[in-house]
Amino acid sequence: MTHQIVTTQYGKVKGTTENGVHKWKGIPYAKPPVGQWRFKAPEPPEVWEDVLDATAYGSICPQPSDLLSLSYTELPRQSEDCLYVNVFAPDTPSKNLPVMVWIHGGAFYLGAGSEPLYDGSKLAAQGEVIVVTLNYRLGPFGFLHLSSFNEAYSDNLGLLDQAAALKWVRENISAFGGDPDNVTVFGESAGGMSIAALLAMPAAKGLFQKAIMESGASRTMTKEQAASTSAAFLQVLGINEGQLDKLHTVSAEDLLKAADQLRIAEKENIFQLFFQPALDPKTLPEEPEKAIAEGAASGIPLLIGTTRDEGYLFFTPDSDVHSQETLDAALEYLLGKPLAEKVADLYPRSLESQIHMMTDLLFWRPAVAYASAQSHYAPVWMYRFDWHPKKPPYNKAFHALELPFVFGNLDGLERMAKAEITDEVKQLSHTIQSAWITFAKTGNPSTEAVNWPAYHEETRETLILDSEITIENDPESEKRQKLFPSKGE
């Protein structure tokens, strides 16, 4: 495939070639979710006649703009017309390459597949793989669950968008040189949490063969929590539950403002995501971790892990230390009352404890639970990313720090952590990319350089990603045993 014009099911697309990589940006995978389609499940895109110019990214989905400067040098356009995929392919004439589909993070209300950090060029070139990045609806546009009030509306729209993008990949990626039967989904934070849900979702069944979950596992609201969140949102807008059609005429700005107001008002539970997937009989019938424990993702190999110091991204040295009541409520919300009482002594009231609580309970414990559940049905590999810069205040392996290494976009490391790009950094990036790519190709991340043993509940082998690669069995064993008491305790 030496030419950049490719024929998809919906029409022709024209991309560019740069540094040995073909790139197609801003290809629609669904109808724009605007007007009557706002808050509705995604529909396939319309067919187009001319060649579509796919040389620039599509708009990002609506989100608060105050944080965008952290990710972009130039602020991108925002629009509800945002359901686009981007495809990166090596410019060698090849067919049936493994496909890696990236699902970005951002707490379900921020982010885009077009962030510079997620440019798939280096990964595609290094690994002879096709990399696909995508946008999905965020915040109230993607995770305002309205089906309790009116059956015409679907819940979990952001997840349905991701499934629609995966369906587009299944139906079109062979035209770009990819193998539709060898698709790996990979994602971080809310992207990892999304994959936890996709593995349990009827709409995503059969659309991918392997999964990589970085710093994010199962995370859902109950149907009741979702309904009360939506009711509170409607109240801020002054719309009653019988007038949902009014939601179609509210401006995107006003929807974002209402979301912001609610997020500020609901701050009392410090560990609750305001927008997140919800349990719902049609789209997500069972809590993902429970579904996985019952074999919902049988036969899908899983690579999963966290960073050692996840929580340090979310607090600064002068962050508030929350009251004991707030911390107790958060523990109870995350663990249920009986277990919360048993582990309270792990987290005495201090800023450091708050940070550890976040690391352990939002990221590490769910990852261990998910890995354990899936290990009965498919091979699982577990990692912990320990590398960190030497200079304070960045001298921790904080949340998202592995991303520049995964994509090989190491300039992102300078931006995120003021870290120098040393030979050691380049080597670690190469090691991580090789493992991820090998997993996408074969379903096993072991390479010639690194023999990575699979994860078993008895031994809990964990690859430690640092300047030196090591293997630890059951890291932080004592804490893990407290957080997972055996049945009789």
Swiss-Prot record:
Q: Which domain of life is it from?
A: Bacteria
Hydrolase as a keyword of this entry, yes or no, is yes
Query: SUPFAM superfamilies attached here?
Result: alpha/beta-Hydrolases (SSF53474)
Give the recorded effect for S230A: In strain: NRRL B8079
Q: Which residues are annotated as active site?
A: S189, E310, H399
The record ties this protein, via CDD domains, to: Esterase_lipase (cd00312)
Q: Report the EC number(s), separated by commas if there are several.
A: 3.1.1.-
Name the reported effect of L463V. In strain: NRRL B8079
Q: What is the effect of changing A291S?
A: In strain: NRRL B8079
What InterPro entries does the record point to? AB_hydrolase_fold (IPR029058), CarbesteraseB (IPR002018), Carboxylesterase_B_AS (IPR019826), Carboxylesterase_B_CS (IPR019819), Cholinesterase (IPR000997), Type-B_Carboxylest/Lipase (IPR050309)
Q: Keyword set for this entry?
A: Hydrolase, Phosphoprotein, Serine esterase
- Which Pfam families does the entry mention? COesterase
**Documented effect of changing G242S:** In strain: NRRL B8079
GO molecular function terms attached to this record:
cholinesterase activity
Phosphoserine-modified residues are: S189
Keyword Flavoprotein (UniProt)? no
The subunit structure is: Monomer.
Similarity annotation? Belongs to the type-B carboxylesterase/lipase family.
Function (record text)? Catalyzes hydrolysis of several beta-lactam antibiotic PNB esters to the corresponding free acid and PNB alcohol.
User: Which PANTHER family does the record associate with it?
Assistant: CARBOXYLESTERASE
Protein known as: Para-nitrobenzyl esterase
Species of origin = Bacillus subtilis (strain 168)
Q: Top-down, what is the taxonomic lineage of the species of origin?
A: Bacteria, Bacillati, Bacillota, Bacilli, Bacillales
